[in-house]
Amino acid sequence: MKTMRGLRNCSNDAVTLDLTVHPPPPPPLPPPAPSTVSSSTASTSLSFDEEETSESKIGRLISEHPVIIFTRFSSCCMCHVMKKLLSTVGVHPTVIEIDDGEIAYLAVEAAPVLFIGGTCVGGFESLVALHLSGQLIPRLVEVGALWA
């Protein structure tokens, strides 16, 4: 077997290629109506009245969802770890992206922030502390987000 100058072959293993023809992907879904925002982690769609204030939207979302995370970016690493921890115990939170101006309505200084049963738990450190203390699962059961 020929090798390129300065490089050597590290393996004699053969590579297998899967040449199976897969069906084409389904067509994309139509965009949501202008006044509706859908969440991939929520079981229901999140609808907003266009005239509703940011403060009342946030308050309503907190009261409607037993476990909700507000974040600046859904791709935030701390938000991802919070979702992963909650999903490990069987809960899939609603995740809402908010902008810097809306953070003030949450009465916290940083995002992501977690609410369980309408009560602010706090950020990632608070969630981990609640879990390590053994209080997370009973609290999730209490608010109906998890079955005992």
Curated annotation (Swiss-Prot):
Q: Name one Pfam family in it.
A: Glutaredoxin
Specify whether Electron transport is a keyword of the entry.
yes
Q: Which InterPro entries match?
A: GlrX-like_pln_2 (IPR011905), Glutaredoxin (IPR002109), Thioredoxin-like_sf (IPR036249)
**Subcellular location(s) of the protein:** Cytoplasm
Cysteine pairs bridged by disulfides in the record: C76-C79
Under Gene3D superfamilies, the record lists: Glutaredoxin
UniProt superkingdom: Eukaryota
Provenance organism: Arabidopsis thaliana
What does the sequence similarity comment in the record state about its family?
Answer: Belongs to the glutaredoxin family. CC-type subfamily.
Spell out the residue ranges making up region: Disordered: 16-55
**Function, in words:** Has a glutathione-disulfide oxidoreductase activity in the presence of NADPH and glutathione reductase. Reduces low molecular weight disulfides and proteins.
Q: Specify residue ranges for compositional bias: Low complexity.
A: 35-47
Which residue stretches does the UniProt record annotate as biased composition, category Pro residues?
Answer: 22-34
| Domain Glutaredoxin stretches | 55-147
Cellular-component GO terms for this entry: cytoplasm
The protein here is known as Glutaredoxin-C10
Enumerate the UniProt keywords alphabetically. Answer: Cytoplasm, Disulfide bond, Electron transport, Redox-active center, Transport
